Every structure is written in structure tokens, then in C-alpha cells.
């Protein structure tokens, strides 16, 4: 009897890890493919480093089908949105899926909203991560010191284009068209307001509330950080802290206020993360006292899965 019991327990011990592994393998397995959309000065990979650092691999490891979009690093929401739409159509053709789940960081959020607005039949959900949905005080300041047609605007545009060209070279991309002025105008409070007038889906009508959770069959979600200097080892923490001064006492991740980042169902708007931490940058050097950014993407994939998306 003891031998039989020992054998049964041994078999159970061997089966439990297999069962747990099988359960974990489907944690992020959404019904529709996930498409990650980068923000301003963004890229797919730069010298082998993901813009969404370690996120695609973490999602794929537990079953998600993940694609990383590559749109203009510097351009208007509409121009980037058209580029994203073309890529979404290709992804649907390749996978045979009926729709995709869009997850956009920073300007990637309004870029995703554009696609959802013009082709709602191709989108299952839009998730905004630190999204510039109501504009940025930083963009407002830049536009103030570089007004339309000014020398300062021309100089800033040339510098931004040169920086983007270098990034594209190291990213090994052929390059999408770059239009810094279009990007800047899209990110100002006025520009974001004009964009939302055309694409209001999921955008809160109050100053800092939630938006509609579902519009035209598309689910809308958002989360963001509200800290600036989060890890002294991260070389981007100090710049985030300096940029955050533009917001005064308003909670911000350094580039976008917490309220501006709201879209649809607000999962949380006060993570101890700055704008780059939200994509697990720089190189995973994030706050030691907050949940891992990668975990948030995994949790969102599981949320989409449980919603049937």
C-alpha cells in the first residue's frame, strides 16, 4: 500500500508541473492578434532592442500572437494612422484573423484610435498606455517657443529629422516619411482636441473621468504612470523629471498628464512609472517598488482573452 501511495504521489508530482505549465501557456492567448504601436521617436527594434522592451517575447511565451508596427517616428496622428491601417490589413491577411487588438504607447494611442475610427470592423480593442489623448504640456511649450513659420521651428524640425535618420539607420529600417511639425501639432492640447473631435470614441467628456468602455463593438482601455524620477540608475529618469516640471503639480509621467492619458476603461493612472518606464525602458531599469511594466501587458492580454477578444 505504501509503495502504491508513493507511486501515486510521485505521478501526481510529475503531472502538477505539467498541468501548471499548460495553464500558464495560454495566459496571454487572445482570440485576435495583438499589435503594439510605438510613440514619438519610436521604432520596432533599435540595435536589437525592442521599443517595448521584453514585452513581445513575454506575450508570445504564453500564447499571444504579437506583431510590432513600424510607423513614422515623427508625423501626424492621421499619417501614422494610415500607415498602421495598411499594416493591420496585412496582418489580417497573413493570420486569417478577423480583427486585431491594438496597444499603443504615447502617440501610438491616437494612432490606434485613428484606425479604430476609420475601420472599426478591423479592430477588437484599443489600449492606450501613457497615451497623448488630450495633448501634452511639453508639446504646448515647444509650440510656444517654435511658432508656425518661425526660424526656431525650422531648426527644431531639422534637428528632429536628423536624429530620426540616425535612429532609422541603426534600426535597419527603410524609413517611413517624417514630418516633425505634423507630430508636434498633433501632440499639443489644441491638436489633440481637434483630433478627438473627429475621433471621439473612448475619450472622456469630463476633465479626468473615464470614457465609453465600448463603441462600435470596440473595447477601449487605458493605464499610465504618474511618476518621473523612478530609478537613479536609469539615464532617462532625470530628463523625465525635468520635462515633468512643465506640468507643475499635475500628476504626470513626465510627458503626458495622468488625466490626458485616460481612454475608455481606466485600469489605473498612478503607477510609479514615467513615460519610458511604461514600455519597460531604459532596459528594464524601472522602479523597484512597482509592478513590472511587462506584467501589465501580460495582464492586459489576459483581460482581453477573458473578454473574448
Name every feature range the model reports, one short phrase each.
Residues 1-61, 309:
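Flexible, membrane-associating and regulatory peripheral segments of lipid-active enzymes
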Residues 26-30, 60-61, 94-95, 103-104, ...:
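Extracellular/periplasmic catalytic domains that process cell-envelope and extracellular macromolecules
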Residues 38, 66, 82-193, 253:
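Serine-dependent carboxylesterase/thioesterase catalytic core
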Residues 39-43, 72-76, 105-110, 131-135, ...:
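Solvent-exposed loop/turn segments at secondary-structure junctions
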Residues 48, 137-142, 231-236:
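Short aromatic-enriched loop/helix-cap "lid" or pocket-rim segments at secondary-structure transitions
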Residues 55-74:
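Conserved alpha/beta-hydrolase
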Residues 171-231:
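Serine-hydrolase catalytic core
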Residues 205-309:
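C-terminal catalytic-base region of ester-bond hydrolases, centering on the histidine
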